[in-house]
């Protein structure tokens, strides 16, 4: 594209960093650029003239600082308690320019308005391509007809930069979409699990010894946790190791030609008696006979493949004990100064078009390796060898290689010198011949036991001359002939013990991540750094990793759930799918749908199994003593949208009295609440959605009731809905009351009101037998017609003698007294036959109501209970029942209990000195 009339065009050039912008401007202008200030004081604008493919251009070169935009949730979802964390898997997200980048955005807008072309000089990887499209979005918003092109370069040297600007290409939309997919997946998964973990654990446990528990975020990252998993798994392997003693026979022979050490070909034995027998046989007949002396074999030790990012990080860690994060920081600085090529690359094979000899020639002046570089270039020396192909090519950058000679700059640290030396020596080794050695193995026989010794003689060091980081150890052994006999100099039985593997060092951890496909070459070091920064792992002086208590507890909790959220499999599949997007085999939408559906299912199930996480944390941490009522309420699980304020969700909560309720998260602005049955021992929100209630979704709650607190016939486990459709919950509230404080203080004789959503009055028109409305249980059409004796009757009500017959099995019923808070002192008939669920209030029969109340199973699935507080609502007055002298108390299940009650909570199953709520209440129980 050129301007009409052949005049110069104005070209806006944008680099990823200010230093890169200055370097590119310096190369293209040959140091003659003019500088002016932009809106951001860090991102200056460089002006110069240049010709692109013969087209005169007025070049404007500026920069961004990394990503120009951030991906965020819509405002409504940003506050932690504004929504159910599960909603974050489908909540709207948007890209926006953060406040600290607004000045850069203004600079781009102003310069784009007066430009004809936009040339993108961002780093040539997926992340750089994504930043490029962020720049495009900003510039096109103010000038839609910009001519947009992309410059591809791998080193900040004259040759690469001039070639890049003369061969501009289209930006790669697929690369940018792959990064968009990764950002959205990481945001949704990370935010949901981070909120879940933090709200669940932070206020329950004393995690931070510095006293900053309340501000701590217990984060989850899709790459971070599998990386932590490698560390924990190795740690567990070490902890589980049990040392085992073993024995081996060692033999050596000293001659005039030197020492030969022979190894037992059995290796070792774990049975001491067997080892001793074999050793004694050798001692009794110690003469050694040479059985086999093969001709020396030529062996080769090949140089390494060309250097990619992962190998650079691993080798810098092994050779110099540099962290991967620091290695990349130093390498980036060397790249920006023009001394090495772009350091973030997966490629480990050079293109056939690369001028390999020119890079060697640059190094011939170096005092340490210059002479070796000169020998490489001499044809008669035979030292040159084309580098091997490692099999990886990211199509964006060549392997890491030196681009400019230096014997050490004045501003370089020791780490800069080491990393530069590693890059240069590695490249020189790649283009060198392999080392050659002659290897000999001698086998001997002593009393029927075989031993062997190996010797190696180096014939040509070749690449090992320059690659000082590797060696080829070996010893020269004396010359032996087949059939030769000798007496060993030493023959010993030595004991040793098995040892566990060592803790993972940084190089090992990078290898695990690379093999499992966790992260990319550009991000692996960052994932490791985050583990250390967030206190999930520590690193010792030998660069070996150990998990902290918090890191181990989190992995243990998820492992106990049965989900492999800490294993690499799930993340490896995501990384594979994102790579498929970058090559066009899958769309961004397909990958997002697949990954997020899978992870949302994991999240919902993990939330149901949260007790596993709590149990694991209990092993490592003390319970926190700073949790107050308001904080415990904020840690609830979302049940539904609040139908009163329509602004926040309603969450399951447990107050300090141990009673459960579903309350609006917008409290105290909104006080909408649904109190649950008083006998509720445990309650957890499930992933089951009620098909009847709305506005949805309304998630069902899994209840576990105290057996002593519910009437016969009701199951202790119940999967119920608080949206208004669950008749079983309504009946339990009618009979047993709720845990609300107002109800606990009601006057004697006041009937409990049903507070399940959608019903504020007693539902007397619901059949307790079939759970249908419109008839009483005595008129239920699904029941067998009552015989003369099946209808419960009380023929002598004034004499406390039961004449009521069970209408199920015909047995004579027993008169008992209820002990639940809502009906304490009220008498009822129940069948003494084991397994029979017949139940009827005595006063309803005497009033000729004929309603025999029987419980029905809820059909809810059971689950293993945890330790409960053993109480429902606070102790109240008995309501409406007769308590004659001599009448014994019984539980609602019909079991007799003492007439003496706990004066703290009113429960007759224990005395006050054994009350489980003794230390958790304010003492007002009357």
UniProtKB/Swiss-Prot annotation:
Its EC number is 5.6.2.1. The active site is at 342 (o-(5'-phospho-dna)-tyrosine intermediate). This is DNA topoisomerase 3-alpha. A zinc finger (C4-type) spans 642-670. Keywords: DNA-binding, Isomerase, Magnesium, Meiosis, Metal-binding, Repeat, Topoisomerase, Zinc, Zinc-finger. GO terms for molecular function: DNA binding; DNA topoisomerase type I (single strand cut, ATP-independent) activity; zinc ion binding. It comes from the Eukaryota. It comes from Arabidopsis thaliana. GO terms for cellular component: chromosome. Residues 750-760 have a biased composition (Polar residues). It is an enzyme of class 5 (isomerase). InterPro entries: Topo_IA, Topo_IA_2, Topo_IA_AS, Topo_IA_cen, Topo_IA_cen_sub1, Topo_IA_cen_sub2, Topo_IA_cen_sub3, Topo_IA_core_domain. The gene is TOP3A. The record marks 80, 195, 202, 344 as: Interaction with DNA. Belongs to the type IA topoisomerase family. Releases the supercoiling and torsional tension of DNA introduced during the DNA replication and transcription by transiently cleaving and rejoining one strand of the DNA duplex. Introduces a single-strand break via transesterification at a target site in duplex DNA. The scissile phosphodiester is attacked by the catalytic tyrosine of the enzyme, resulting in the formation of a DNA-(5'-phosphotyrosyl)-enzyme intermediate and the expulsion of a 3'-OH DNA strand. The free DNA strand then undergoes passage around the unbroken strand thus removing DNA supercoils. Residues 219-224 are annotated as: Interaction with DNA. Residues 873-884 have a biased composition (Gly residues). Binds two Mg(2+) ions per subunit. CDD domains: TOP1Ac (cd00186), TOPRIM_TopoIA_TopoIII (cd03362).
